[in-house]
Amino acid sequence: SNIDLKPLAPVFLSIALFAIVERASSEKEFDRGELLSYPFNEGSNFGGVSLSIDNRLLVVAASNPTPDNPQNIDLFTTTYIVNGKNDAGDFSYYWGGLNLLGPEINTPMGWEAQPALSAEGDELFFASARENSTLDDDGNPTMDIYVSKKDENGDWSHAEKLPPPISSSAQEKAPFIHPDGKTLYFSSTRLPSGGGYDLWVSRRDSMNVWSEPVNLGMPVNTTGDEHGLVVSSNGNEAFFASRRSGTKGLDILSFPLPKALKPEAVKVIHGVVDPTPPSDDIILTL
């Protein structure tokens, strides 16, 4: 299908969000999906999304026109709210209204999009082109990757541009921070490149210093554009958007991630917490 948005990281390879939601069968084949209901698709143009690993916090890019910037794109958040149990005894949920992130992240004359939440939901990476952005070799404002951190009160810090070697004179966009909290995948026009946007990976150490980015190489990168790479929580499978020979516009592709490009191994416990007080002690064994 001609989907022109980056995929959202499917934590358990069961759900992927594009412009629509698509669910995988046991054979990992996706159906045609369904449009998301309120607060999505309510008149604004919606772009990239990112979902926390507990599926409770979602960040989405959406149009937010202003008199001085009718093309303004900003970042919003929404939370998944427990709505009690339904007649079948199952918990039901709904997405709350969209909340515009503040001036620490959004800028009135800039472009903030392509969010990437950390697994803990305490770091937000995103791409932005701003009034003070430098120009690339073609005279276009450069997109850079920024990060904001949530404090103990739940407030987001002033977003800072990632330092070199992540930032460069080229275009950087479409970040994805793996649940290991260390491995960052992103798209860039930097050299060496096969052409257009290529996919890159960098890792940060205990001192919060990023390693020199590594190009994912052929056959993932081509002379066309590749971006929006996301990696499953187990680190085995990657999904990305590509405009290349044989595709119809910008399509979503997947591939098994080679060992050299994998993030650190993480263990994710998936379940539903029942707020009903237990009648006895609960023992959890890993």
Spans of features found by a protein language model:
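Short, conserved micro-motifs composed of acidic
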Residues: S1-V272, P277-I283
